[in-house]
Amino acid sequence: MYPLIYRPGVIKMLYLGYRLKEAYRVRRADTHLALAYRSKFYNELWRDAASQIGASIEPLGNEILEIRLGQNRTRVQQNTTSIDRVIDVAMTVNKPLVHRLLAEHRLQTPACCEFTMNEIAKAVAFVDSVATKCVVKPANGGGGRGVTTGVTGRLDVIRAAASAAVYGSDLMVERQVPGDVYRLLYLDGALMDAVLRKPSAVVADGKSTVRELIHFENEVRLKTGPNLAHALILIDMDVRRTLSNQGLTLSSVPKEGVEVVLKQVINDNSRNDNVSASHLVCKSIIEDGAAAVAAVGVRLAGVDVITPDPGIPLAEAGGVILEVNTTPSYHHHYYKRDGSYPVAVHLLPFLLANSVAEPHPSVA
């Protein structure tokens, strides 16, 4: 007989609990303020890019901006542009599909397994078979929501699956690959920029709990605005698992000066966690990233690579291509510890050159 936690009714209660937490998070005032900062960030970067080439810009509503230069025009909405086709977005949010496409082109990807909440045993069998830490995540979507790392057993799988299911019924579990996350940004197969993205961390003051340290960090982010971070640190299963691996909980009071890593999922990180990496990534990895973009068939994409050594090929280092993202975030390219890569400044001339020219009015 399974322990109580393994019973379907209890699993459903866990899922409902996570749904309530997410509903509360969405309605919080600080969440709305963070979203407003994100909107401001994109509005300002497109206006700056337009001004640098003498283009005009007109808000059309719903955060859509129309940018004109001579007879050419293009439209953008935050990090969505005119070259981001609906079908491309639909494909790239489907992580198992992207994994299959990359595997067909013999690119390095992590072993994975698709499942639903009714197939927990299937996911547990996969975790047992790989005999190492795994990652549970929604099979569709992005932004790091519902992703839990460090999953090692049945109880972990159940909790992580309940958390992931808040964001979609189709789930996946994959082998967790050791190493750092590198975001490679491509346009038509050419590398634009590469960023080493470290996970969020806080430095203990010797008197505050980890929960309080997270609160203080989020307060700093809200006061500083989008120049520091475009998201708040969400306390989720990944935070709890990452702390547990360090022998900590949210109630722990670490010694002064100790750096506490908060998450392995890097989507909530800040400017202080991003480092320029174009000079670190070897030619082989850059070529693999371009091949991944071509395999999926997209034009502007952010490719996430995990590797312990970016200076050698992925197959040698044991690294993988994790995801191919359309409508990639620009924030970590603009805001790094050691400089900035203004994506919109480089991208806008391309968008205008590849736009449809304004039609001339017909003469009756």
Feature map (PLM): residue ranges:
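Active-site nucleotide/adenylate-binding loops and adjacent lid/helix of ATP-dependent enzymes
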Residues: 68, 74-78, 83-235, 282-287
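ATP-binding N-terminal substructure of ATP-dependent carboxylate-amine bond-forming enzymes
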Residues: 1-93, 97-100, 118-121
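Hydrophobic faces of well-ordered beta-strands that scaffold small-molecule active sites
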Residues: 136, 171, 301-303, 322
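C-terminal active-site "lid" helix and adjoining low-complexity regulatory extension at the edge
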Residues: 270-283, 294-300, 307-364
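Short glycine-/small-residue-rich flexible loop motifs, especially phosphate/cofactor-binding loops
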Residues: 47, 99, 124, 240, ...
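Short aromatic/hydrophobic-glycine micro-motifs
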Residues: 54-56, 107, 132, 169, ...
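Active-site "cap" helix and flanking loop/linker of ATP-utilizing ligase/carboxylase catalytic domains
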Residues: 207-246, 250, 340-364
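A long amphipathic alpha-helix within ATP-dependent nucleotide-binding catalytic cores
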Residues: 163, 167, 217-311
